[in-house]
């Protein structure tokens, strides 16, 4: 009886704590995407396709289902060349979806001598690492919401990938049931509010942040957009879904009054706060685990422009 009890407790511990994401995992995913070998992941390059395949492999590790067809890779055309977004599904108890996204492309390399690779660790390998971390968290759990994970291509060329996938009729079965989209854009550094905090672009357009914060665990907080005048809400991939009248916001930690790495060669792993990222990812997972269609149904107000 004691052995059985010990075994039961051991199994309980495994399944209770297995979803906790390690800093080593966060480092591995982000460092791979932001490595020199990826050469800045510019859309249309072999390295960009390598990044897409790497993300697809991570989705497979997490046993995600395909969004459409027989692959995580969702093709679209870029200057006569086939390029890819990456998309995977986690079925939950409800058929209502929460979406998690970021963009994996960056701006490639320059012609100058020395360090000429724009690694894009913060922009936006950090966002992809965050959504992969959420998928990791729920690998052995069944969330209340179903979940869709989307890694967009071509953001740096004008949000091409998010525009393509948001208008893909093969995914309407997801979009018609989507409660909200969390788009992660530059979350590698500590925010102006300190650790364990993000801000939401366009916070004045919906009550998503309020509803999320009501359920947030361990001090995690989504703050108001400190750069509202720059209208970042309309300048990132979330806007492709805003146009579909889906609740969609971007979430960031970057302090734009201090950051010197945006679209520069020094946006590499050396500027990443892996402890903070790991804390945020785990607390996002724990908070999302509390959300259901009963306590999380955000709505736009009449201030948003579609």
Regions found by a protein language model. Name each.
Residues 21-50, 62, 186, 258-264:
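N-terminal capping segment at the start of a domain
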Residues 36-46, 74-77, 113-124, 137, ...:
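Second-shell loop/turn segments in exported
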Residues 88, 100, 106, 111-158, ...:
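Alpha-helical metal-binding/catalytic segments enriched in His/Glu/Asp
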Residues 152-250, 299:
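Metal-dependent peptidase/peptidase-like ectodomains
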Residues 230-277:
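Zn-dependent metallopeptidase/amidohydrolase metal-coordination segment
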């Amino acid at each position: 009886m004691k052995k059985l009890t010990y075994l039961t407790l051991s199994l309980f511990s495994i399944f209770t704590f297995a979803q906790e994401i390690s800093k080593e995992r966060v480092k591995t995913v982000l460092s791979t995407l932001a490595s020199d070998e990826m050469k800045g992941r510019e859309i249309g390059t072999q390295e960009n396709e390598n990044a897409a395949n790497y993300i697809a492999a991570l989705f497979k590790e997490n046993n995600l289902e395909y969004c459409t067809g027989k692959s995580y890779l969702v093709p679209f055309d870029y200057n006569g060349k086939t390029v890819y977004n990456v998309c995977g599904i986690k079925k939950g108890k409800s058929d209502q979806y929460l979406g998690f996204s970021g963009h994996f492309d960056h701006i490639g390399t320059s012609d100058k001598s020395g360090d000429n690779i724009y690694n894009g660790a913060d922009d936006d390998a950090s966002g992809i690492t965050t959504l992969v971390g959420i998928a990791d968290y729920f690998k052995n759990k069944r969330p209340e919401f179903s979940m869709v994970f989307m890694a967009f291509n071509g953001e740096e060329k004008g949000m091409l990938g998010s525009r393509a996938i948001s208008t893909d009729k093969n995914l309407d079965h997801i979009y018609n049931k989507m409660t909200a989209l969390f788009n992660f854009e530059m979350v590698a550094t500590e925010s102006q509010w300190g650790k364990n905090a993000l801000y939401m672009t366009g916070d004045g357009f919906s009550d998503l942040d309020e509803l999320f914060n009501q359920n947030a665990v361990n001090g995690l907080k989504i703050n108001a957009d400190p750069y509202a005048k720059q209208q970042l809400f309309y300048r990132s991939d979330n806007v492709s879904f805003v146009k579909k009248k889906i609740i969609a916001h971007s979430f960031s930690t970057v302090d734009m009054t201090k950051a010197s790495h945006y679209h520069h060669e020094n946006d590499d792993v050396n500027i990443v706060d892996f402890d903070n990222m790991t804390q945020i990812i785990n607390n996002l997972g724990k908070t999302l685990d509390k959300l259901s269609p009963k306590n999380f149904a955000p709505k736009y107000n009449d201030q948003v422009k579609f």
